[in-house]
Structures are given as structure tokens and as C-alpha cells.
């Protein structure tokens, strides 16, 4: 059972979080399997009412420390690395407001190199009155979920487990026992980091029960 199927089954009450799970291993890459696949995930394009295009575009510039590769009346492209754009925002006439509870993309996630970078970003955005709606240590990641002006969810995260140990982590039973995670207070976590507590220790998932799914912000 894939992690996504496992999560879906848990939300539907099909299985109990009793620690039972199939053995996990990192699948071979498409290239290793002799397949031709995309070289990379290039960008995400968001559509919004024309009058909000630049507000949404500016939000992503602030959150991602991005710059506009191209900007016009209809919207623009935001980059923060060597890709010409990672986020595009386009104003479409006649677009209706976001409706909670409909099928579609849940969120887009951005990974930081270390917890200190995530902490810096949290306090930087706090000064801009941009705060996470939900903060949770999933086990594999420490994650904060934000809403953009159109209520699209954006996850800012850091990996808790080195890439080469992911398969081992999924096989040790911790994730199977709780594939959702444990909520945390970013103020508390990052102040402990500033006080000198080891990043390795702070990335460990704290003891506790997973939140009820009703606690997750709707979008």
C-alpha cells in the first residue's frame, strides 16, 4: 500500500493506526527502470481574478524571497533559484471564488535546507503578518501550512530524515503508527532552536496523538 493510499484509508477509517504496514523501500527512479520521464518538476501555475493577480504574485515574492522574471497586467512569473519561474500567476476574467471541499490539488510544498532556514522564514513572514494556519511534524518532515490570498495551501518544510534513510524510516513502524503527525507550536520550537537546542533533537517528532482531520485547514 502506498503512503498516499495508506493516508486515504486512515481518513476513511478503513484501517487502524496500529503500527502494521508493508515493508517500505525507495522505488527505483524512472531512469533506473529504463524509462523516459520528466527531467524535473518545473513550475506551478495559479489562476485568479484579474484584480487580484498582482496581490497573489506579490505574496509569492514575499514568501519565497522571489523576484519577477516577467510581470505584466495579466500577472507574472516568480523565480527564486536557477529556474526561470517556479510559480506563475495569471489573471483570468470570470474566475469564481475558491470553494472549500472540492476535489483538486491540496497544496504545493517547498523544502528548506535546514531547520534554521525554516525558523528564519517563519519570523521573517511573521513581520509581514503572514502566519501559518497549521504546523505539524509529520515524522518525515517538519511542516508549516500557509494560505495564499486565494486560499491555496503552501507548505514550507524541512526534511527530518536524510534522503538515504527514508526507506529505513518508513520501515521502522513510527510512520505507520501515525502517518499524519503531531502538531507543534512554531514559536516554541524555533525559540528552542535559538536557545541552542540541537536541530537533530528538534526534528524528532514529539510524543502525542495525531490531530483530528477536522483540525486541518480546509481549502
For each predicted feature, which ranges?
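Short acidic N-proximal helix/loop "leader" segments that mark the beginning
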Residues: 3-39
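Eukaryotic phosphotyrosine signaling hubs
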Residues: 41-43, 103-108
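Long, compositionally biased, intrinsically disordered segments
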Residues: 60, 101, 109-111
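Vicinal oxygen chelate
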Residues: 47-54, 108-219
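Core segments of cupin and vicinal oxygen chelate
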Residues: 35, 46-87, 91
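Short glycine-biased active-site loop of nucleotidyltransferases that positions the nucleotide triphosphate
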Residues: 79-81, 97-100, 145
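Short beta-strand/turn micro-motifs at beta-sheet edges
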Residues: 30-34, 92-99
